C-alpha cells in the first residue's frame, strides 16, 4: 500500500526548490502517494495538477502563521498523511509543530538557510534560532550541499543531518538532443554574445547587480546582450534599472518559461 506523503513548499511559482519538487515527484514509484501543500498558487501547482497530483493551496506569506494551523491540521487528517516533507524554512515553520502534535514524522529539506550575512545581527540570530527549532522538530534534516550542513553546524549546532546534493534532470537537460534556436524570438543576432539570467526576480538573486554588470560589460564589448527570464517581487525595480541604464534594446526580459533547455 502506498504511503501518503505531504510535500510542503512555500510557493507554487517555479524556482529552484519548486523545480526540485517537480523532479522529485516525477521520480516516485507506486509506493508513494504524493500530496502537495503550497502557500501560493502558480505554475508549479498547475503542472502538478495536470499530472494528476493532488494539490492544496493555503494562502499565506508568513512563517509560523498560527492563523492557518487549523486548516493545515484538518487537511493532514483528512488526507491520512503518514509522512511530511517540508521544503524550505517557511514551509517547515508552518507544519513542524502540527507534525509533532499529531506524531507524524517530518523530513526537512534545507534549500538554503533563512539567515545570511547581509542581515542585521538581531535578524540573523532570530532566523538561526527558528532554524534550530525546526531542525529539532524534524525526524530528519536533508541539506542539499555540504556547505549548508557546515553552516548549520557552526551557526546553531546542527546535529542530525544528511547531505543529498541536487541533481540535474538528464532527460530534460540532455545535451545530445535537438534544441530550438530562440535568438530570433528575442531579437538577437548570431553575432550577439548573450548572457542569461534564469530564476526568480528576487533580492537573493541580485537582479539589479545583473543589470548593472551588463551595462558595465557593454562598455568593453558592444556584442554583449542579455536575456532575463523569470518573475518575482523585484520585477518592476529590475525593469526600472534597465531603463535607468539605457539597456532597453540590449536586455530582453521574459516571464517564466518551461523551455529552459532551449533558452540555455
Task: Label every model-predicted segment.
Residues 15-26, 193, 197-219, 226, ...:
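A conserved mid-protein helix/loop that constitutes part of the nucleotide-sugar donor-binding site
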Residues 43-50, 227-248:
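Short, structured helix-loop element that forms part of the nucleotide-activated donor/catalytic region
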Amino acid at each position: 500500500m502506498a504511503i501518503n506523503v505531504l510535500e510542503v513548499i512555500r510557493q507554487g511559482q517555479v524556482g529552484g526548490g519548486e523545480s526540485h519538487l517537480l523532479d522529485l515527484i516525477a521520480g516516485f514509484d507506486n509506493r508513494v502517494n504524493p500530496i502537495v501543500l503550497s502557500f501560493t498558487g502558480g505554475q508549479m501547482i498547475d503542472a502538478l495538477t495536470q499530472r494528476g497530483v493532488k494539490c492544496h493551496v493555503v494562502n499565506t506569506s508568513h512563517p509560523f502563521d498560527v492563523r492557518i494551523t487549523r486548516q493545515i491540521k484538518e487537511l493532514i487528517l483528512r488526507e491520512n498523511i503518514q509522512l511530511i516533507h517540508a521544503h524550505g524554512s517557511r514551509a517547515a515553520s508552518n507544519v513542524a509543530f502540527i507534525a509533532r502534535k499529531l506524531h507524524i514524522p517530518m523530513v526537512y529539506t534545507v534549500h538554503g538557510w533563512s539567515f545570511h550575512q547581509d542581515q542585521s545581527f538581531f535578524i540573523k540570530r532570530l532566523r538561526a534560532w527558528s532554524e534550530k527549532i525546526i531542525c529539532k522538530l524534524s525526524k530528519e534534516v536533508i541539506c542539499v550541499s555540504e556547505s549548508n550542513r557546515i553552516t548549520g553546524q557552526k551557526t546553531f549546532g546542527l546535529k542530525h543531518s544528511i547531505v543529498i546534493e541536487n541533481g540535474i534532470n538528464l532527460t530534460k537537460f540532455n545535451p545530445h538532443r535537438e534544441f530550438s534556436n530562440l535568438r530570433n524570438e528575442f531579437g538577437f543576432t548570431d553575432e550577439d554574445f548573450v548572457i542569461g539570467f534564469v530564476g526568480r526576480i528576487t533580492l537573493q538573486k541580485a537582479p539589479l547587480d545583473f543589470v548593472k554588470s551588463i551595462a558595465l560589460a557593454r562598455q568593453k564589448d558592444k556584442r554583449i546582450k542579455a536575456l532575463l527570464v523569470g518573475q518575482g517581487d523585484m520585477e518592476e525595480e529590475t525593469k526600472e534599472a534597465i531603463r535607468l541604464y539605457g539597456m532597453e534594446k540590449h536586455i530582453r526580459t521574459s516571464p517564466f518559461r518551461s523551455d529552459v533547455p532551449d533558452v540555455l
